[in-house]
């Protein structure tokens, strides 16, 4: 139970911590600052751990998404969604859900996305809601299409709904695969027999569905999110005690993000958060003086590049709630893990050289000040 009275429902944090420690031999390495290698000279290596948690698709008030799924004359499908793919793979995930529900290949799905003139309202690409909120809206719309396909097929094949299955763009009678109708034929039958119905489905999904709009703003009490993601991260850093230069050499993320619909995209999100935390920890800082920005260009404001990246490893923790039932019960992934790896980096610097820094970025100057080598 959280301080606001919310119930996290499902938490894999303990398992995340245990797996992260085991995978990195954390207990064996921590507290034993050591040279990075036999020939590294003044470079010391340390290890640190951090944990994080984040909401899924809600912030201050509930958010919602709507989608439409339409069967085309040739048996392919068009998905209409307001979801915006900014590189996180939202379009891929949403098409995967349609493909799974309707048992057809991904190449048979056309997606029309983020066109405010033609697509329904969407939560947007923020607060980690695309896979959970928009994904469930797509599931609902796809389910409506599936039910219409089954209903038309049951009438034409003179079979009960319980005896019908979807397979390879056909509806067939279980145990009698020769008794089947293609999606293309079912669309034609629907238009002929059902007043031109082209077989369409609409889906709507809202977060914290049982709560009123704008819940508990005055008291901060109540339900704020359907679920919370958890993670534990371990960082290994190397610090040069003569120059103060520090770098991240290894990052391990063990996450409880519900059921990973697309593990490759999950790993991409994790790599992204490691990169963001790397910039936060060692480089990025807006310098201000008398209301003016002193480093307004990319020459002065440093950000990580491919040359600064560290080895990143990702381990899934799928808790029992998500292994049994509740389809597409994803949690947040990527956005909230920046805080965990940042804390791990800070703890690793402390483990390496005994300097506890409370201000980012951890520049050579701040590390050398902590070591007492400069004032």
Regions inferred by a protein language model and the residue ranges of each:
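Cofactor-binding beta-sheet edge motifs in enzyme active sites
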Residues: 1-15, 22, 28-375
């Amino acid at each position: 139970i959280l301080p606001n009275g919310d119930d996290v429902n499902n938490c894999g944090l303990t398992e995340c911590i245990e797996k992260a420690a085991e995978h990195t031999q954390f207990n064996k390495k921590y507290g034993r600052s050591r040279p990075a290698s036999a020939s590294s000279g003044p470079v010391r290596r340390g290890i640190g751990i951090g944990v994080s948690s984040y909401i899924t698709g809600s912030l201050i008030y509930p958010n919602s998404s709507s989608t439409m799924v339409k069967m085309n004359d040739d048996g392919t499908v068009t998905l209409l969604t307001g979801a915006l793919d900014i590189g996180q793979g939202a379009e891929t995930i949403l098409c995967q859900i349609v493909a799974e529900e309707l048992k057809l290949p991904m190449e048979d799905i056309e997606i029309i996305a983020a066109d405010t003139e033609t697509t329904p309202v969407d939560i947007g690409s923020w607060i980690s809601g695309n896979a959970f909120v928009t994904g469930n809206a797509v599931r609902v719309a796809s389910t409506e299409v599936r039910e219409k396909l089954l209903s038309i097929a049951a009438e034409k094949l003179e079979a009960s709904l319980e005896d019908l299955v979807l397979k390879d763009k056909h509806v067939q009678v279980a145990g009698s695969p020769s008794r089947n109708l293609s999606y293309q034929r079912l669309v034609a039958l629907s238009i002929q027999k059902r007043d031109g119905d082209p077989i369409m489905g609409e889906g709507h999904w809202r977060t914290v569905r049982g709560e009123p709009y704008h819940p508990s703003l005055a008291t901060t009490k109540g339900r704020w999110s359907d679920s919370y993601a958890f993670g534990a991260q371990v960082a290994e850093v190397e610090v040069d005690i003569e120059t103060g230069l520090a770098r991240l050499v290894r990052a391990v993320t063990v996450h409880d993000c519900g059921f990973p619909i697309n593990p490759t995209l999950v790993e991409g999100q994790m790599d992204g958060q490691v990169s963001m935390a790397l910039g936060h920890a060692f480089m990025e800082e807006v310098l201000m003086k008398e209301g003016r920005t002193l480093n307004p260009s990319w020459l002065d404001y440093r950000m990580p590049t491919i040359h600064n990246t560290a080895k990143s490893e990702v381990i899934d923790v799928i808790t029992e709630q998500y292994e049994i039932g509740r389809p597409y019960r994803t949690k947040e992934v990527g956005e909230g893990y920046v805080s965990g790896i940042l804390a791990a980096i800070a703890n690793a610097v402390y483990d390496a050289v005994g300097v506890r820094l409370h201000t980012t970025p951890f520049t050579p100057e701040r590390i050398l000040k902590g070591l007492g080598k400069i004032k």
